[in-house]
């Protein structure tokens, strides 16, 4: 089993604070070896770069380790990266590596936190094949994923921080969901 996770905007390389909390929680719930792949991208505004890296890695895993169950996830900008990989059937806007047909059979679950794409609808609207395998979590009045009054963004910004998700038990909630899909 492998978790492929894209960190949030401006987080240091790796899976980020929330990614680490989610993976730790998942490890405590399953009796399996869990490897981790941190999506390699600058985590600034480069969604396409992250999506290409995630997609290339997933395709490589499907080809070279076809029995490995994959869990895809992301926080904030990383959730948008995951959205592109799962929902874009063709290359566009710098994303040039759509997943081939049948790849979905290797993806056990998807965990998204603070997903800005919620403004246009959940990922499952665009890629319904993942409906029963996806958990999308939005913490309270997080202005990134909860369409709220733009005048409240500054006051509500702390709701979007990784620590708020962790403190609210959402890393654990996602781990419970994913563990149930394995």
Q: Where are the regions that the model predicts?
A:
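Serine-dependent carboxylesterase/thioesterase catalytic core
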Residues: 52-135, 143-144
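Hydrophobic/aromatic beta-strand patches that form the interior of the parallel beta-sheet core
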Residues: 4, 37, 111, 133-138
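Active-site catalytic motif of lipid deacylating hydrolases and related acyltransferases
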Residues: 1-69, 141-180
């Amino acid at each position: 089993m492998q978790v492929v996770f894209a960190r949030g905007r401006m987080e240091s390389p790796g899976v980020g604070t929330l990614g680490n909390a989610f993976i730790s929680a998942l490890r405590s719930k399953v009796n399996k070896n869990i490897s981790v792949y941190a999506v390699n991208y600058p985590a600034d505004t480069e969604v396409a770069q992250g999506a290409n890296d995630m997609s290339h890695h997933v395709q490589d895993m499907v080809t070279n380790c076809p029995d490995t169950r994959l869990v895809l996830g992301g926080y904030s900008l990383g959730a948008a990266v995951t959205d592109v990989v799962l929902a874009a059937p063709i290359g566009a806007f710098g994303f040039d590596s759509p997943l081939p047909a049948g790849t979905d059979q290797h993806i056990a679950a998807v965990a998204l936190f603070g997903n800005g794409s919620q403004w246009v609808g959940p990922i499952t609207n665009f890629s319904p094949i993942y409906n029963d395998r996806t958990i999308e979590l939005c913490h309270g009045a997080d202005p990134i994923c909860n369409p709220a009054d733009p005048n409240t963004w500054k006051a509500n910004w702390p709701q979007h921080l990784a620590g708020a998700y962790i403190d609210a038990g959402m890393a654990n909630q996602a781990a419970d969901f994913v563990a149930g899909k394995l």
